[in-house]
Structures are given as C-alpha cells and as structure tokens.
Amino acid sequence: MPAATNTERTSTRGRWLPAFGALLGAAVFLAVRGSLTDDAYITLAYAKNLAVHGEWGIVPGSPANSATSPLNVLLLGALTLATRVTGGPHPVVALGILTVLCGGVLGWAWQRLGRSLALPAAAGVLGVALVLLNPFVLSAIGLEVLLIPAVLLVLTVLAVEGRPAWFGVAGGLAVLTRLDLVVFVVVIAVSTPAIRRRLLPAAGFAVVTAAPWFAVSWVAFGSFVPDTLVIKQLQAGLFAPWSYGTGPVMYYLGWPVTVLVSFLPALLGVVALAGWAAARFGARWPEFPALGPLAALGAGGLLYYLTYSFLGVGPFHWYYAAPVTSVSAFAVAAFGTWYAESRTRTALRAGPPAVALGLTGALALGGAAVDVAQGLPWPSPVIFGNWASATDYARVGTELRGQLGDASVASPGEIGTLAYFCECAILDEFSDRGQAVTLVDKRIATANPLMSLALRVNYHWLDRSVTPRKPDYRLQYASGPATGPDSWQVRSAAKGVGHFVLTREP
C-alpha cells in the first residue's frame, strides 16, 4: 500500500503546472504587449502577410527570407488567420495566444519531468518562472524566445521518457524553430541511450517533420537558412568592440542588476553541470539519478554559446535566450533531484540543495522585481535600443500609409513596426530580396574558406538576377525634435527625442 501511495503521489504531482505556466504567460504578455521591439514586429508583419495574402515576406508583394524562425511565423500566421473570424487580422492577439500556449507547454514539460524524476513541485514552478520572468526573454517577446525553451524542454522530456519517435518529431520542430537548435537535438540524442539505440528511426521522424519546409525554402527562396544569418553577421560591427562571446559584459555595464538576475541562474547551471559530471563519472553511485538528458540540455546550451561566439554574430539580446534558459533549466532539475534524493538517502543532507533551490528562487524573484520596476504595463522593454517606442512607430507607420499610397520608401534602418502598421513597400535588406542578394555575395566573398563553402552550398539555388528595388521616397532618422514638414517627432527610452524625415528620391 505505501508503494502504491507513493506512485500515485508521483503521478499526480504538479498537475496544475500547465495551468500555472499558461496563467503566468498571460500575465507577462499583458505586461509587455504594448512595448514590443522592432524585431518582434518583423515577425508579426510576416504573420500578418501570411494570414492575409498567403505570402512569405514583411511587405505585401515582396517575397523575402528574413524570418529567423519559420515555426514561429507559421504558428503566428495560423493563429492570426483564426482571429480573422472577428473581422480583420489580429497578429498581436495571436502572439498573446502563443505566449499562453508556450507557458502551458513549459508547465506541462516540468510536470512530466517532476513525475519522471520525483522532483518537488517547487522545481517546476522555478523552471517556468526562470523563463517567463527573465527580463532578457521578456524584452524580446514576439521573437522565438519562448518557443525555444518550450520545444527544447519537450525534447528533453521525450528523451527522459525514452520515446524516440516523438523525440524525432520534437527535434524536427526544434530545427524549424531555429536551425541552430540542431546543436541541442544532436547532443541530447547521442547522450540518451534510449534515443541513441533507436537513432535512425528518431532521425527519420525528424527529417519527415522538418524536411518539407527546408526543401521548399532551398528551392523557392534559394536558401536553407534565413538571410538573417548573413545580415546579422554583417551587422556584428554595430557593437564593436563587443562580440557575442563578450556580450554579457557589455550588457552588464548598462544594466548590471538585469544581467545578474537573468544570467546567474545559468551560471549556477554551469556549476551544477560540472558537479554532476564529477559525481557521474568520478564515482560509482548505485541507482544514479537519470539526469543524462537534462545534463545534455545544459551542455547543449554551452556548446550553442561557443558556436555563436565562433560564428561572429553580434550580441543581440535575444540570441542569449537558448543558452540561458537551457542551462538554467538544468540547474533547477539538478537541484530538485538533489533535494529529492536527500529525502530518501540518509547519507545526503537536505540543507545544501534546499539552499541552492532557494537561491535560484531568489534570482527568479529578482527577475520579477526588475520586470515590475519597468512599470506595468511596460512603456518599453528593459533591454531596448530602438529609435522610437512601439507607440510612436505605430503612429508614424499609420500616417505613412496614407501619405505614400502605392509608392515605395527606403527604410531608415528599423523596419518592423513601420512595415506592420504601414502595410506599404518599405525597402531594406529584410524586405527587398535584391538587397539581400547583394549582402549574401558580399558575405561569401569576405568569409573564411569553411564559412564561404557552407554559404555557397546553402545559396546554390539563389536567384542572383534579382536586383534591389529603387525607392520613391527615403525615410531617415535624426536625433532632436522635428522641425519641418513631412517629419514625425518620436521618443525612445534608449535614444531620447528624435524624428523621422520623409524625402523624395531623385
């Protein structure tokens, strides 16, 4: 009877975690919905264009391949299409729904991990909170920053449960979320005996899930990989002398408290990973806790960080979502397992893991404090560098739509929010494939031999006959208040007062 009771308690532990994750997702979305970054609106513009016109691009009538996360756009596009039952498309509402769903998936994944590893329910709460309260993550809502931890945690759950077919499906969804997440898929697969023994079937399901999109992308758009890889590599100099590898230090100099509460859980995860490796391979433990897939998740985060440092991309803050959330997840799982083991093994003391969980919880609360200190709802993201607030960009974009008509305009350098609200031909490398082709050729010519070869293979089918479109107008940004006609004054928490000026091209 006691054994049956313990089994029943384990199977029902944390059943409320999916609801908790969904509710917390709804709460944070209500807080941030009016302060989305310009890059988030690039994704929303893609989703709107897909739902309304059935086109893959930022602006209608101009196909592009600058959506970093195909799965994010496809999900948002489908949800936006569903919102049309109320009239017009509502991509921001679709984003809210997806945020709630991601929160629920995180809760579900932690509930399953809790059942498999006998984790305390508090570990699941911490695991969800470290994602949904992280200021770096919330500052990039609209991009794939919630989809990444959701799909990676589901992938890990399926590895823990030894389900190779579904692991393959989740692996395919992971690379559709971001192609670079293949790092996690491979590391977790080869580190989990149940998956490794059935590697071919798992790989087959992954290919069946992801290959159709990549085949279409390679032929129709001339590239497996979104053009943003090339664009962001060429923009790395914007942050000079900082790089992706040193980016956390750069952000610490500007937002020290925010960086501490966002990155310290991952640092604890690195320490926990080293401790796990020492205990796992340095001594023979009877019935050692089955943390292998979760350790692989954390190791994947470290390898991802090293890979991005090697690629030479700039330290855009949303690029840290994958390593930070994955290594933080391992920290929670390791400390939770340590605590659970201490309750059944007399040789282990419960105090140290309880302190570790408490410290992790304090960091999650610190993240919440930073979020609340920003003001509710957020007037701007905590980590922010755009020239104008989302509200001001919306005003400028709406007025541009009436002024431009069918004419085209060169982007000032930030295109997402303007394109979303203007629904007009705003041109730059993100929306005009001709400009993207020019950048691709430049990157191939300047890359090292290995990168150049990879890019040549990737862009084998690229239509290089496409030339940049000539704009009818040009929109330019300058600091200070607006002073003349065809200008709009804006304000940004990062840049202060500035203005945009519209001029006719000769």
Model feature map: region roles:
Residues A3-P506:
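Membrane-proximal envelope and lipid/glycan-remodeling enzymes
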